[in-house]
Amino acid sequence: MFLSESIQQKWQPVLDHPDLPEVKDSYKRAVTSMILENQEKALKEDAAFLSEAAPTNATGSNIQNWNPILISLVRRAMPNLIAYDICGVQPMSGPTGLIFAMRSRFNAQNGTEALFDEADTDFSARNKAGSSVSGASAAAQTGANPAVLNDSIGTSTGYTTGDGMSTAYAEALGDASGNSFAEMAFSIEKSTVTAKSRALKAEYTMELAQDLKAIHGLDAETELSNILSAEILAEINREVVRTIYRTAEVGAADNANSNAAINTSAAGIFDLDTDSNGRWSVERFKGLMFQVERDANVIAQRTRRGKGNMIICSSDVASALQMAGVLDYTPALNNNLNIDDTGNTFAGVLNGKYRVYIDPYAANLAANAAGAKQYYVVGYKGTSPYDSGLFYCPYVPLQMVRAVGQDTFQPKIGFKTRYGMVANPFAGAGAGDNITADNVGAINSNRYYRRVQVTNIM
């Protein structure tokens, strides 16, 4: 629905307004068009409400006067949300929505998930009862690492492969109840996302409005509206970032998320003094880059979707990568990117493939102190808006209410927004795990992101 060409054509004058930053990304244009449509619908519904700020015979004009300001703010804010860069954005056309996931299964709909881990080379060479037709045991395929073959050269202990069935056995399949074909199935699972709300209000006196206008040339209602709306949008930005921080799996650990350390002194921690060899700082910083690559590789193994391709980090980690000569800062200047200083900051491209974002709110004051803790989060976001570990689902981005106090007769304004947030159904910490309704996932559970603490950076 939100990809409808007619909706985009309707809002093209707003999307292409010369006084506003250009929205080049086609998906951002589509999502912004849908949000503008939802906003217009909400404003039309509110136009029928009784407003205390004016007589009952003027309620329509009282609210409609605010439409252009609301629409302009939505147009400015929506394309600049960090959600477009680090998670998926799926606008909702109603207060609730469904997310469906199809899983391939062995044997039955409640069987083990298939097409995720390595294919079992012996499964289709058995009958349904599990009898191996190649003469080997039912578990003919063993091992996961071919390197173990070199432990005892000349034998295949610890790493075996199933092979196909003979013609005679294939012809006999199905001739008896105990010799039926091996079977596969699929299951359709769903999780729901429900719109939640944020709300703020502000009050001011008519005397304040008069004095502010006379002395500073400012409109009190406009300034307070900007404050309220900016705060709500900033909070949504931080909710997205902090949710990823909280739910990301522990990095610098094994790929089963059991927090067992792999070649680091402690799981989840990369200590540049002990975990990275080098004669001087730049060589140790390159060791940090190798650890980033390893975590990105684990994401590919854990999701089977792709290698990690974006990083959120503290500024000192980004500086270390830049000093190592692997972070190219120039794209941020050459591409004229719109960097939001109050939200995410695009730093550049790492090794030609990782988009790096600096969190300006990361605690960074004790960077040189003993035991100072820096961090990075590496994650995967595909080219499709459906290919992400977390989904931000805007419904009505901004809704304004105006009223007058019944006792003081002083003006009041309020803003509300509605949106949902849910994790990818496949983001659970184990094969076959599912995300429940309205759930962003438990702590350390989202396999699309990995979080690492970096210590002794200096």
Please annotate each region the language model reported:
Residues 1-127:
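Extended assembly-interface regions of large multimeric machines
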Residues 92-95, 194-196, 303-305:
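Extracellular/periplasmic catalytic domains that process cell-envelope and extracellular macromolecules
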Residues 157, 251-277, 428-439:
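Surface-exposed intrinsically disordered loops and tails
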Residues 108-126, 246-250, 426-440:
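Short linear, low-complexity motifs centered on an aromatic residue
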Residues 1-19, 247-248, 260-264, 327-329, ...:
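Short, intrinsically disordered N-terminal pre-domain segments
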Residues 220-221, 236-262:
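Short, glycine/acidic-rich hinge or "gate" loops at secondary-structure transitions
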Residues 77, 83-85, 164, 168-178, ...:
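Sequence/fold signature of self-assembling virion shell proteins
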Residues 89, 98-195:
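Assembly/oligomerization interface modules of large self-assembling protein complexes
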